[in-house]
Design a protein with these regions (language model features):
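Short hydrophobic alpha-helical membrane-anchoring segments
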Residues: 18-23, 608
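Gram-negative and organellar
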Residues: 29, 72, 101-102, 118, ...
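N-terminal leader/linker segments that initiate helical-solenoid repeat arrays
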Residues: 22-69, 76, 85, 230-233, ...
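Bacterial N-terminal signal peptides
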Residues: 9-20
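Mid-chain, structured segments of secreted extracytoplasmic proteins
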Residues: 64-105, 109-111
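Bacterial N-terminal signal peptides that target proteins for export
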Residues: 1-11
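Inter-helical turn/loop elements of alpha-helical hairpins
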Residues: 47, 78-85, 523-530
């Protein structure tokens, strides 16, 4: 700005000086004034010289060459746009050779190659004896990508008259622009010989090697200049990422060396060399990303992008750092800036895909990965090889497209895609790992373990395989083994997000676990079986694993109701031990109840996963928690013996049959059974709709003869829907709203059948891996001995690892 203001004042003073002189004096001294301005430029007073020439033009003082000299000075001063503007305004039909050369170079500097070539051809015609014109025309044609024409121009007699070194430099430039490195180096080598090692010629030759990423070769030709040293450091960055030691502990050696070199160059660089400093910082940004020093990379990217747009290679590194640092919106924007310039950039497209996944934008994620997959050919072919070869990039993209469905909770579609890929390429470790993940998600631990072990067998040193084996150990309650394997990974890969997540998960599994549920309610109706104001609450506290397979636990329950006979309550406390091995869990616990009735009790449970699809459960409990509260007012209790069999096809479909036998102390014997079928009807990202059909029946030997609700025989047939919608998710934290509604028929012997129903709405918060919290409201309609009871209830639940 200061320079512009200074130039404006100089121009104003020059105009005033000229305006104050007699007109005939100005005309008589135009040439002298022009030449005086040129002399000022030669003396280094470029701004003053340009201002004087502009003032002469503005005052009409011109000998026909003022504009031409101004064009020349502007081009020499690095102002091609101004030079072209003056040249075009002058519209001189026969500009002198020096001005024509300057205008041609100005057009070339602006990338207006057609205009530059037009002027160069005009110069060739007007000044056939001047060899600068064929050389300049050749350079312009090379810049325009018309290298064959450029080489033809250099073969003309006019070009042959040029100085050999100048002609060879033009030819070398043409070959360089054509991408023929060998021919360019051959020509430049001859130019170096003829020029007796001229440094300028050596620098031109070194540029060829810099173009092809050979800065050490460039240094051998031209010496270690700062730009070449910068290129060497950039090459070290690329090699550090591409060529890594097989030992994981040394995988960053090359990148660390590159960072040290860049830091040294930046420390020694003069502050005024801003262009090279920015280039070194851009390379350093990439190196920081490769070294997974992501916070530093993000901060460097923030600073560099504030100074101007980033080139694609740096924008990619910046986006990767932003994604790592959990700034997915900014990462998406960075990748999109790359794609705006290069829509087919594969790295940027994968980055945009992962950013969309983190943002729960699965419409964009699916579209991105599916398009990328479709554009990858199934086969690759190579020159002089008639055979077709598998394209590994296609396989990777197809696997990632399947995993996208896994991320979107569409496990069925993900599984079908992956099985097809695995059947076609059974030795693909990446696909096997993806199968492991989805099998885990579908609740198939045996299949998951099988896939993890296959993947580890195919690539035992692969980080993903090693993580999978640790997860298998955790799921099998082999916590000590998992900790040992995890310690090895943390020592080698402390920066890896998957390793960090695994450490958090293992830590969570080895903590205390508190589970609490509270359900207050208020009922009206129900006749003599009305519950009135009521509460059901229960809590369990589990210890951390003991010797991997054991846990101690304490339990506490408290319930109350207000039947017609009055207030009744039951408190229960107990403690027990849980034993867990793969596929089997068993517990045993004694209890003590107090309140309306004081009595000891206890129980035992066993759950056996016979296969990935079949689960058998059994339980026995003395003074069962299912004893009706109203019965306690009369000193009546019940034991319970129950069994359940479940068949799960997968996470979206299951059928279960249950049986329970409750002998009461008053002689009543209750037998109950049920059948439940569930199937997910709609499964899209962020939303699931599950249908449920249930049949339940019971019989009591003292039906209708007890002081508690005790139908002789009853049957309920209910159907319902459960809608689950992810309202918000941010990495480990999420909020889901769930609405369930069911209705059906209830039939009781001796009474008219009636309809029953339940409507429940709740919020579920998750702060993985430690906290789950839910709360909701429920409306129920039930029928007892022909009387309808309506209930308003609330639910609060907490699952907290401590």
């Amino acid at each position: 700005m200061e320079r512009a203001l200074r130039g404006s004042w100089i121009l104003l003073l020059a105009v005033l000086a000229l305006a104050g002189a007699p007109a005939d004096a100005c005309a008589q001294t135009a040439t002298q004034q022009r030449e005086a301005a040129v002399l000022k430029a030669r003396a280094g007073q470029m701004a003053e010289a340009q201002a004087l020439l502009r003032a002469m033009l503005a005052s009409g003082v011109d000998d026909g060459l003022v504009a031409m000299d101004l064009v020349t000075l502007l081009q020499q001063d690095g102002k091609p746009a101004d030079a072209v503007a003056v040249f075009e305004k002058a519209a001189k039909p026969d500009p002198p050779d020096y001005a024509l050369v300057a205008a041609t170079r100005a057009y070339r500097d602006l990338g207006r190659y057609d205009d530059a070539a037009r002027l160069a051809r005009a110069g060739t015609r007007r000044f056939p004896g001047d060899s600068v014109w064929p050389l300049l025309l050749s350079l312009v044609l090379s810049d325009a990508g018309r290298t064959a024409e450029a080489l033809e121009v250099l073969r003309t007699p006019a070009a042959a008259r040029a100085a050999p070194v100048e002609r060879l430099l033009a030819e070398g430039y043409a070959w360089r622009r054509a991408g023929n490195t060998g021919a360019a180096l051959n020509v430049y080598g001859e130019a170096i010989r003829l020029s007796r090692g001229n440094q300028g010629v050596r620098s031109e030759a070194a540029g060829v090697l810099l173009d092809v990423g050979a800065p050490w070769g460039a240094a051998a030709i031209a010496g270690n200049t700062r730009p070449i040293e910068g290129q060497q450091a950039g090459a070290m960055v690329r090699w550090g990422e591409q060529v890594r030691a097989p030992e994981p502990a040394r995988r960053f050696d090359g990148t660390d060396a590159a960072l040290a070199r860049l830091d040294a160059l930046l420390a020694a660089l003069p502050t005024d060399d801003k262009d090279l400093r920015r280039r070194l910082r851009l390379d350093r940004l990439v190196a920081l990303r490769d070294r997974v020093r992501m916070k530093e990379a993000m901060e460097e990217g923030d600073a560099l992008s504030a100074d101007g747009p980033l080139p694609a290679f740096a924008e990619q590194a910046y986006g990767d750092a932003l994604l790592y640092m959990r700034r997915p919106e900014d990462a998406r924007d960075a990748y999109n800036r790359i794609l705006a310039q290069s829509p087919k950039d594969v790295q940027a497209r994968y980055g945009a895909f992962f950013a969309a996944v983190e943002l729960d934008d699965f419409a964009t994620a699916y579209a991105t990965i599916d398009l990328l997959t479709s554009e990858q050919p199934v086969w690759r072919s190579y020159r002089n090889d008639p055979a077709r070869h598998d394209n590994p990039e296609r396989g990777y993209a197809e696997t990632m497209a399947a995993q996208a469905r896994y991320y979107g909770n569409q496990l069925g579609e993900a599984w079908d895609r992956l099985v097809k890929l695995s059947d076609a390429a059974p030795a693909n470790g990446n696909t096997r790992l993806a199968l492991y993940q989805v099998a885990n998600g579908r609740g198939w631990p045996r299949r998951a373990q099988e896939e993890a072990e296959i993947a580890a067998g195919l690539a035992p040193r692969d980080l993903g395989s090693r993580i999978a084996l640790i997860e298998v150990a955790i799921n099998a309650y082999r916590f000590t083994e998992a900790e040992r394997m995890l310690d090895e990974l943390r020592a080698l890969y402390p920066e890896d997000l998957a390793v960090r997540r695994l450490a958090r998960d293992l830590d969570a599994k080895r903590r205390w676990l508190l589970e609490v549920k509270v359900q207050p309610s208020s009922s009206d109706g129900g006749g003599t079986n009305a519950a009135g104001q009521a509460l059901i609450s229960e809590a369990r506290l589990y210890s951390p694993p003991i010797a991997d397979n054991w846990r101690l636990f304490a339990l506490g329950d408290y319930s109350y109701a207000n039947p017609p006979e009055g207030f009744v309550q039951r408190g229960r406390a107990g403690g027990g031990v849980e034993w867990r091995v793969p596929w089997l869990t068993a517990t045993v616990y004694p209890t003590q109840s107090w309140g309306t009735l004081v009595k000891a009790g206890g129980g035992a449970t066993v759950d056996w996963w016979v296969t990935d699809h079949i689960e058998l459960s059994g339980s026995a409990e003395l003074f069962s928690a299912d004893t009706p509260l109203r019965a306690l007012l009369f000193g009546i209790t019940a034991n319970e013996y129950a069994a359940k069999a479940t068949y799960r096809w997968h996470e979206s479909r299951s059928v279960a049959a249950s049986f329970a036998y409750l002998p009461f102390t008053d002689g009543n014997q209750r037998v109950a059974g049920g059948l439940t079928y569930k199937e997910r009807l709609i499964n899209i990202p962020r939303f699931d709709l599950t249908g449920r059909a249930e049949a339940y029946a019971s019989t009591n030997t003292l039906g209708g003869l007890t002081p508690y609700y005790n139908p002789s025989q009853d049957l309920s047939l209910v159907g319902g829907l459960l809608a689950e919608h992810v309202l918000w998710r941010r990495y480990d934290n999420s909020l889901v709203q769930a609405l369930s509604a069911d209705a059906g028929l209830y039939a009781e012997q001796g009474y008219a059948s009636n309809w029953i129903g339940t409507l429940n709405y709740e919020h579920r918060w998750r702060f993985d891996p430690l906290t789950e919290f839910r709360y909701g409201v429920m409306l129920m309609r039930r029928v007892y001995d022909g009387s309808v009871e309506n209930t308003l209830g609330f639910t609060i639940g907490l699952r907290q690892r401590i």
